[in-house]
Design a protein with these regions (language model features):
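Active-site-proximal or metal-binding-adjacent scaffold patches in catalytic folds
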Residues: 1-92, 101-180
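Walker B catalytic acidic pair
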Residues: 97
């Protein structure tokens, strides 16, 4: 968890208001349970995280079989989600984390049903966001000379790997995209 900047705190607060209002509209929980989400602190993940888009952190010693909103220490979102181009996906990620904060610990069928109640398109952008993060932080691109597929990576391939699509040996190319 990283402490958000002033701008990030403002963006997180606006995001929280939007998501809580939408959760009231779709009737996820009763109003008092939703209001219990309001005091949960929002923070940001480290900028170099590539796999995790958000996380709900529970306090140590919380009873895992009976999680309550009071047991939530913080909800962290990836700082790049606060960029306006990812706003729709950021709302979905915060909604997802709030479902955890309401006591839905596992990604089981019941959790997925609640997740599907989200009325906006952002939910489909998860894979795209992961690829964006990997591309941003990659030092090397493993490039297929045959089909031009690119695999962003931290290390060189040195001819040890083949393309998933056509089995051609991958070539190392320095990633020229700027990391923010």
């Amino acid at each position: 968890m990283a402490k958000p900047s002033k701008e990030q705190s403002i963006a997180l607060s606006q995001l929280k208001d939007e998501v809580l209002e939408q959760m009231k509209t779709i009737g996820i929980e009763d109003e008092s349970r939703l209001n219990s989400l309001n005091p949960i602190p929002l923070a940001v993940l480290r900028r170099n995280a590539t796999q995790r888009h958000g996380v709900t952190r529970f306090r140590r010693g919380a009873n895992a079989s009976e999680l309550k909103t009071e047991d939530v220490q913080t909800v962290d979102l990836h700082p790049m989600l606060l960029d306006p181009s990812w706003h729709d996906y950021a709302r979905f990620v915060l909604y997802h984390e709030y479902l955890h904060a309401l006591g839905n610990r596992f990604h089981d069928a019941a959790f997925r049903r609640l997740e599907q109640l989200w009325p906006h398109d952002g939910a489909e952008r998860g894979r795209e966001f992961t690829q964006f993060l990997r591309q941003r932080t990659a030092t090397w691109l493993w490039v297929c000379a045959t089909c031009d597929k690119k695999y962003p990576r931290k290390r060189r391939a040195n001819g040890r790997f083949r393309c998933r699509a056509c089995s051609t040996t991958l070539v190392d190319v320095m990633n020229t995209q700027e990391a923010n």
